[in-house]
C-alpha cells in the first residue's frame, strides 16, 4: 500500500482498526501523519481491579474465578449482572464449568469456536433465568460481542497460534496476553451499564507486558504469502518493505516448504507447478494435492477432502452428549484413513440434500450432531474450487469406489503432506519427519490400531505433539515423491557373479526417516572408479562369473590357445637330442654329453 501511494499519490485510502493506538502508530510512521478519525460507541465507565494480594496469587485461577462469581452473585461489587470469564482453551472451560455447576440461579454457558450452533445461540439469546456466567476463549475478545455483560474476569492468558521454524510445527501455547488484548477484554463490559474488570494479575505485571500482540505475519507460516508475492512479481521477498518484517528464518522456512512442494526452483523462481498452485484459492499444500489428484484421475475425491480441510470441522461434539455424537459420526469412519471419512460424510450429505428440503436438512444436521452452517460452508468452498479447476481445464470425473481409489487418493495427499509423515516407534508414539515425536490424536480412527506408517493433515503442539487427521500409507509410496528430498546412502559394495556387476546395499531416507534399507542396486552408476576396481579384483582376476562376457570369453580363448602352443613347444624341446638326457663320460647327465657355457660348448669331465 505504501508503494502504491508513492506511485499514485492521488489515491485515497482508509485504514480501519479497533485499536486506535495502532492506527496512530502506523499513520505517523508510514502515511505522513495522515488524519485520524475516531468513531467510538457509547460506553460506560469500567473499573479495573488487579490481583495485588500475595495470598490471592498463590491460589489457583479456577478457585479465584469461583470465588469472584460467588461474590458477584452476592452483590459485593455492585448490582448483579452477567459475567464473562476468559479461558485459554476448551479444557479449562470444561473444568471451570464443572466447578461452577450446581449453584442456585447461576446459568453457566460455554463459548468457543467449535461449539455447536444451538449452544452458541444460548449465549446470544438471554433467557432471563438467573445470573449468566459465560466461559469463553479469546473468540469473545474481538470477534463476538456478548450482550448484557457487566463483569469481566481476565486471568491474563490465552492460547495463541504460533509457528515454530525450529520444529516446523504450528504450536498453540498458552501465553500471557498483551496490554492491547487486556484492554479489549476490559471493553467487553461497560456496554449496558457501569462495569468492573477483574484482572487476576498485578498492575506491575500488566505494565510489563508488550503493548501489542505480535502481528500474524510474525507467527504464521509464510509459504502462502511468498507464493502470492512471487506470482504478483513483487520482487525479492527478503527485501520487501513489510510493515512488520518477518524473521529471515521464517522466510527461509517458507521457501523450504515451497521447494518441498516443487513450487519454486533452486533460484527461488516459480515452477510451472508453482504457477498453477498460485491460481488455487487454498493453502499451498492443499493446492499441490489438487494438482497431483488431477494427474491421477481422482480430482473429484481430492476436491472433497481439500475443501473439508479448508473449513472448520462440521462434526459437533457437545460435552454433555459426547457418546451420542461419537456414535453418529462413527458411521462415516474408515479403518484405514480419516480422510476417507470426509468422502463418506460427503456422499451421505449429498444423498440427503437431494431427498430433503433445506429445512429438513437443517433438522437432520441438528439431530446427527452436524453444523448446518459449516456443512454449507464446506459445499461453498468445494464449489469455488471446482470452478477454479475447470478454469484450469482440469477434468472433474465422477467418484469411483473407495477400494479402487485409495492408493491414488493418498498418493496425491502425500505430495502436499510429505512433511507430516511418521513411522511407528512404539504403540501410538511415532517418529515424525525432521526428528520430531508425535502421537496419534485420540479422535483419529488410527488411534486404537496405529499403522506402521502414517501421514497426518497437521502436526499440532498443545500439551504434546499430536498427529491429526491420519491415514495409513505404504512406505513404497514415499519413494515416488520428489527425488530431490530423498537421501540415499550406499554401503557394502561387492562383486556379484550372478548379475555380473558390482552391487551395493541402499538405504533411502526422507526427512530423517528410513523408508527402505538393504535393497541391492547397481553401484557403477554411483561410484564408477570403485566399481571398476572391485570388478577387476573380484571378477576378472578371480574369474568369478556365472556367465562370462564376450570380451572375457575371447581373452580366455586366446589364453588357452597360447597355453596350448606353449605346451606343444615344450614337448618338441623334450624330443631334441640335447634334451634326451644322455650321460657324459663322467657319468653326469648333461645336454648331449657336453658342458655348456654362454658362448661355447665343451665336454664335461
Where are these regions (language model features)?
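Sequence-structural signature of the catalytic-core scaffold of metal-dependent phosphohydrolases
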Residues: 511-515, 524, 528-529, 533, ...
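Extended, non-catalytic structural segments that build the interaction scaffolds
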Residues: 242-247, 512-524
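Hydrophobic, Leu/Ile/Phe/Ala-enriched alpha-helical segments that form helix-helix packing faces
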Residues: 69-72, 100, 189, 385, ...
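P-loop NTPase motor module signature
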Residues: 1-289, 393, 397, 424
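Second RecA-like catalytic domain
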Residues: 79, 105, 110, 153, ...
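Short, intrinsically disordered, mixed-charge
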Residues: 32, 102, 483, 537-541
Amino acid at each position: 500500500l505504501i508503494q502504491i501511494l508513492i506511485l499514485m499519490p492521488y489515491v485515497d485510502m482508509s485504514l480501519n482498526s479497533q485499536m486506535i493506538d495502532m492506527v496512530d502508530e502506523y499513520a505517523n510512521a508510514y502515511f505522513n501523519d495522515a488524519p485520524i478519525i475516531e468513531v467510538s460507541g457509547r460506553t460506560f465507565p469500567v473499573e479495573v481491579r488487579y490481583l495485588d494480594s500475595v495470598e490471592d496469587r498463590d491460589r489457583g485461577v479456577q478457585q479465584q474465578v469461583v470465588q469472584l462469581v460467588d461474590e458477584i452473585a452476592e452483590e459485593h461489587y455492585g448490582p448483579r449482572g452477567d459475567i464473562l470469564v476468559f479461558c485459554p482453551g476448551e479444557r479449562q472451560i470444561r473444568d471451570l464449568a464443572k466447578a461452577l455447576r450446581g449453584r442456585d440461579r447461576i446459568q453457566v454457558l460455554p463459548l468457543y469456536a467449535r461449539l455447536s450452533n444451538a449452544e452458541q445461540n444460548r449465549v446470544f439469546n438471554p433467557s432471563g433465568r438467573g445470573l449468566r456466567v459465560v466461559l469463553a476463549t479469546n473468540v469473545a475478545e474481538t470477534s463476538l460481542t456478548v450482550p448484557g455483560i457487566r463483569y469481566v474476569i481476565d486471568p491474563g492468558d490465552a492460547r495463541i497460534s504460533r509457528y515454530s521454524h525450529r520444529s516446523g510445527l504450528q504450536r498453540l501455547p498458552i501465553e500471557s496476553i498483551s496490554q492491547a488484548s487486556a484492554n479489549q477484554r476490559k471493553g467487553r463490559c461497560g456496554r449496558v451499564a457501569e462495569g468492573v474488570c477483574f484482572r487476576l494479575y498485578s498492575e506491575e505485571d500488566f505494565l510489563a507486558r508488550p503493548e501489542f500482540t505480535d502481528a500474524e505475519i510474525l507467527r504464521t507460516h509464510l509459504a502462502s504469502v511468498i507464493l502470492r508475492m512471487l506470482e504478483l512479481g513483487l520482487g525479492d521477498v527478503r527485501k520487501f518493505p513489510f510493515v512488520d518484517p518477518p524473521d529471515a528464518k521464517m522466510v527461509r522456512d517458507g521457501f523450504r516448504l515451497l521447494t518441498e512442494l516443487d513450487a519454486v526452483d533452486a533460484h527461488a523462481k516459480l515452477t510451472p507447478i508453482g504457477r498453477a498452485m498460485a491460481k488455487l484459492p487454498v493453502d499451498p499444500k492443499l493446492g499441490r494435492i489438487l494438482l497431483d489428484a488431477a494427474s491421477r484421475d481422482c480430482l473429484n475425491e481430492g476436491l472433497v477432502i481439500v475443501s473439508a480441510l479448508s473449513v472448520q470441522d462440521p462434526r459437533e461434539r457437545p460435552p454433555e452428549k459426547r457418546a451420542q455424537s461419537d456414535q453418529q459420526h462413527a458411521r462415516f469412519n474408515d479403518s484405514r484413513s480419516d480422510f476417507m471419512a470426509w468422502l463418506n460424510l460427503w456422499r451421505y450429505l449429498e444423498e440427503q440434500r437431494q431427498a430433503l428440503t433445506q429445512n429438513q436438512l437443517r433438522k437432520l444436521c441438528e439431530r446427527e450432531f452436524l453444523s448446518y452452517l459449516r456443512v454449507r460452508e464446506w459445499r461453498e468452498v468445494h464449489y469455488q474450487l471446482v470452478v477454479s479447476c475447470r478454469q484450469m481445464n482440469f477434468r472433474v470425473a465422477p467418484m469411483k469406489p473407495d477400494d479402487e481409489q485409495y492408493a491414488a487418493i493418498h498418493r496425491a495427499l502425500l505430495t502436499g503432506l510429505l512433511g507430516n509423515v511418521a513411522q511407528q516407534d512404539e504403540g501410538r508414539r511415532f517418529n515424525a519427519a525432521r526428528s520430531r515425536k508425535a502421537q496419534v490424536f485420540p479422535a483419529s480412527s488410527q488411534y486404537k490400531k496405529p499403522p506402521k506408517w502414517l501421514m497426518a493433515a497437521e502436526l499440532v503442539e498443545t500439551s504434546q505433539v499430536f498427529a491429526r487427521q491420519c491415514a495409513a500409507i505404504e512406505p513404497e509410496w514415499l519413494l515416488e515423491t520428489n527425488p530431490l528430498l530423498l537421501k540415499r546412502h550406499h554401503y557394502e559394495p561387492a562383486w556379484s557373479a550372478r548379475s555380473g556387476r558390482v552391487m551395493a546395499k541402499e538405504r533411502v531416507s526422507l526427512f530423517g526417516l528410513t523408508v527402505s534399507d538393504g535393497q541391492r542396486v547397481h553401484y557403477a552408476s554411483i561410484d564408477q572408479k570403485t566399481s571398476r576396481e572391485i570388478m577387476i579384483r573380484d571378477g576378472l582376476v578371480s574369474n568369478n562369473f556365472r556367465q562370462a562376457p564376450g570380451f572375457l570369453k575371447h581373452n580366455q580363448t586366446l589364453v588357452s590357445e597360447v597355453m596350448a602352443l606353449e605346451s606343444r613347444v615344450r614337448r618338441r624341446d623334450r624330443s631334441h637330442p640335447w634334451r634326451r638326457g644322455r650321460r657324459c663320460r663322467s657319468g653326469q647327465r648333461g645336454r648331449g654329453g657336453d658342458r655348456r657355457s654362454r658362448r661355447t660348448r665343451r665336454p664335461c669331465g
